[in-house]
Amino acid sequence: QTQASLHALEQFSSSYDLTDGLGLAILMPKWMKYLLDRDETVIDDFARFGVNVMGVEENEDKKAVAYQAIEALQCFIKDELGLPVHLSELGIDDSRFEKMKVKACYGQESLPRAYRPLTQEDCFNIYKMCL
């Protein structure tokens, strides 16, 4: 089983001529939020990331800690690294998202062997969050 679904999702670099790192910086917080909104099994991982990596204060409400982790990551990317956090900041629209979702899933209906399974529709929705 692979956990590289985030890298599979990162189609911005080939579709819009962005660097892979910038694409991942825009994508990762949205991917995390998308998963957290739909799959409570990610709460512990994302909360642990928040505490251990982003310096979020640990408390009993792990879901709140997980959301704080995502916010802290997005703020770090924008404020500390000075990178855009939305595709619209780069003048990018959604005109290529349909093709990107197919490429992200390697032409299949979904990425079942990902950290968490993602369908093409999931990929499309995450891309929309990046606008």
Map each language-model feature to its residues:
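Flexible, glycine/charged-enriched surface loops at secondary-structure junctions
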Residues: 1-5, 59-63, 83-90, 112-120
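Gly/Pro-rich interdomain helix-loop hinge
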Residues: 12-96
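Short acidic alpha-helix initiation/capping motifs at coil-to-helix transition points
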Residues: 3-4, 74-82, 100-106
